[in-house]
Amino acid sequence: MRIRILVPLLLIALGATAQGKKTVFSTMETNHIRVATPGLFSQRELIELPLEDIPDTEYSFPLPGGKVISPYGRGRGRHSGIDIKTYAKDTIRSAFNGVVRMSKPYSAYGNVVVVRHDFGLETIYSHNFKNLVHCGDTVKAGQPIALTGRTGRASTEHLHFETRVNGQHFDPNIIFNMKEQTLNRQR
């Protein structure tokens, strides 16, 4: 199944291609979570994520065995991701192959890792006790990238997990079946 996501194009300039991954990021990209990448989609406002083409070996649930305790979009404010509960210092894994765009403390996110994947998809992992990767590192699906914690604005150990395209967050449930901890290939 192909997931279609409307992507607002903000600027036209040079940037990563939809298929290619940059290994050198701008200062803006390494310092901010919400960053639109100009030219990422070559004038298209719609991208497709071919979930059916992703082999199981190129996907990993970011926190195997964890339980969603706060869904996307609900709560006192607009929740830009989901919260997955586990025990302290549990291993967080990269959901897909990609390149680390950001790895540092960042405001309410606490210690955060942002990984850019094919098709312009980015996954965000925050409130980490410790980040295990650095900006520019290439990561594989399932590779440990951080340990769960409660840094930033967090009241308990958990993973705050987001999916973004061109700086815009969207519901991770579009791509992931949180209950089964698999890709949502049958949506």
Question: What residue spans do the PLM features occupy?
Answer:
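Zn2+-dependent peptidoglycan hydrolase active-site motif and core
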Residues: 94-132
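Polar/charged, compositionally biased leader and regulatory segments
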Residues: 2-8, 14-71, 184-187
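Conserved, short, structured surface segments that act as functional micro-motifs
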Residues: 117, 137-187
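A structural micro-motif recognizing beta-strand termini
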Residues: 58, 71, 85-89, 116-118, ...
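A residue-level detector for short acidic-glycine micro-motifs
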Residues: 70, 86, 102, 127-130, ...
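Short glycine/threonine/proline-enriched tight-turn/helix- or strand-capping micro-motif at secondary-structure
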Residues: 48-54, 65-94
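Short, acidic/hydrophobic/Gly-rich beta-strand patch recurrent on exposed beta strands
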Residues: 82-85, 112-117, 162
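Short, well-structured beta-strand-loop connectors
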Residues: 91-102, 133-148
